[in-house]
Amino acid sequence: MAIDFKELCNIICPIIKKMPMHWDGKKCILEMKQNKARNWKQMEWIGWYFEYWCNRNLKDVMEMPYSKKYGKVPFDGYLKIPWDFKSHAIQSGDKIIVNDLQAIKKAINDFGCVGLIIVNGSAAYDNELQYFKEWHDEQKGKETSYEKQRKKRGAPSRRRKVSMKISKISFVKLDNDCLDKYGSIYNQGRNANGKPREPKVLLDLTEICDCTEYVIDNE
C-alpha cells in the first residue's frame, strides 16, 4: 500500500506549528536538564532540543522513538514510516548530515520512504570570552570526557550556539529517487577503536525542493 506522505504531514504539522520559533540556549538546556532529557550536556544542543521537543509533543501520534533498529541504528520516530528530526543552522552551509546510509536504504526498501523534519534557522554564537560555554560547563558540574580529550589533544574549543531563530521547517520525503538524485556519502572517520565509522547520507538543502512535500515558513 502506497504511503500518502502529505496525509502524514497533515497529522504532524499542527503540532509542530506550536513549537517556539526562537530557541534561547540557556532556557532550552535547562528545560532538558530539569526534565531529565538525555544529551542536555551536548554542545550541539539545537539538534538535541528539537529531538527532545518532538519526543514530548509528538508521542500521541508517533511511536517515539521507533522501536525497530537497523543494525544498531535507530530512527527518531515512527508514523507509518520511520522519521528523523534534524536541526540546521544556516551559518553551517547548505548541506546537512542525516542518518546512516545503509539504515536509510533498508528503511526505504521496507516502507518506500523515510520522513525527515528539518528545522532551519539562523544561530547566534558565543562571544570570544565564551561566557555561554562557561555557563554550560557549570551546569554539567564536572568536566566531561569529551572536554578532557579535547584539552589533551590541545584542540581549540568550538564556539557554542547561544540561540536559534527558526526560519522554516521542511518535511522531506526521502525515497530512492531523492536519495539517488541528491544524496551523497559522508564518511565520518574512525571510532575510538580505530575501526571506520559507517557512512551517513549528506543532503544539499538547496537541491531537495522536489522532495520537500510541506514547508512551515516563519520568515
Regions found by a protein language model. Name each.
Residues 1-73, 78, 87-219:
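Nucleic-acid endonuclease domains
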